[in-house]
Regions:
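The feature captures the beta-strand-to-loop junction immediately N-terminal to the Walker
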Residues: 18-20
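Helix-to-loop junction immediately C-terminal to a conserved catalytic motif
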Residues: 32-33
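Conserved ABC transporter NBD signature motif
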Residues: 41-48, 58
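ABC-fold ATPase nucleotide-binding domain signature/coupling loops
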Residues: 44, 98-127, 131-148, 152, ...
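Conserved "ABC signature" C-loop
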Residues: 69-113, 133-140, 212-215
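Helix N-cap at the start of a conserved alpha-helix in ABC-type nucleotide-binding domains
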Residues: 154-156
Length: 238
């Protein structure tokens, strides 16, 4: 739930959003997708209330990857470009997502079909990211990434998001992640707490402030070191 939420996102910039579970991160992403509309207040796109824009036209400008992304029992090509795209565009998106060699474009991504195959959770996540990158190549200008790489390790996620930010540098990109090694690369970072923005700035600015972001970043860095040494798994935001 968002409460007295006020945030301006410059076009063609990247914004990372962090905060504890229930802070309002996913709510914001779903509002921007117009999966539902705000009960009070509003969202403006270039000064126009989002609710006044044609829904179909708006969604054609947005691509989103959520943690519970869709897995189509279709060919690899149709998973990356459900609405269709040139093969060169599909292949370029797969390469940028680190999934260039997963399967032939005509391979069905499901067991039970002739020549079909299934993928691991991490491989499916790369397919979902390739779908977003393909949409960008086809004209989408707003990219929403809500914990889309939870099944990748820390280094794998950092590598993917460096590629994503490079590929979407002309887009407005919003990244939601628990991993600070990833969010630090965004142009700005927003810290949400109880539905409100409590800190906003670059990684270096927020570290210098010594506030909530600095506390969470330092704690996760220590726990990541412990995880490397002991094989344990920690989540600093829970």
């Amino acid at each position: 739930m968002l409460d007295h939420f006020d945030l301006t996102i410059p076009a063609a910039s990247s914004l990372a959003i962090v905060g504890q579970n229930g802070a309002g991160k996913t709510t914001l992403a779903k509002l921007l997708c117009r999966l539902y509309d705000p009960q009070s207040g509003g969202i403006e796109i270039d000064g126009v209330d989002l609710r006044e824009l044609d829904l179909e036209s708006w969604r054609a400008r947005v691509t989103a990857v959520f943690q519970d992304f869709i897995r189509f029992e279709l060919t690899l090509r149709d998973n990356v470009a459900p609405a269709g795209a040139p093969d060169d565009t599909v292949r370029a998106a797969l390469e940028s997502a680190g999934a260039a060699n997963l399967a032939n474009l005509d391979t069905v991504l499901a067991r039970g079909y002739e020549g079909g195959t299934d993928l691991s959770g991490g491989q499916w996540q790369r397919i979902a990211l390739a779908r977003a990158l393909c949409a960008v190549r086809l004209g989408a200008g707003l990219v929403l990434l809500d914990e889309p790489t939870a099944q990748l390790d820390v280094r794998g996620e950092a590598e993917i998001f460096e590629r994503m930010l490079a590929e979407t540098r002309r887009c407005t990109t919003i990244l939601i992640s628990h991993r600070f090694s990833t969010v630090r690369h965004a142009d700005r970072i927003c810290v949400l707490e109880h539905g409100r923005v409590i800190e906003l700035g670059t990684h270096h600015e927020l570290m210098a402030q010594g506030g909530r972001y600095r506390t969470m970043f330092d704690l996760q860095a220590k726990r990541f070191t412990a995880e490397e040494e002991e094989g344990a798994t920690y989540d600093v935001l829970n």
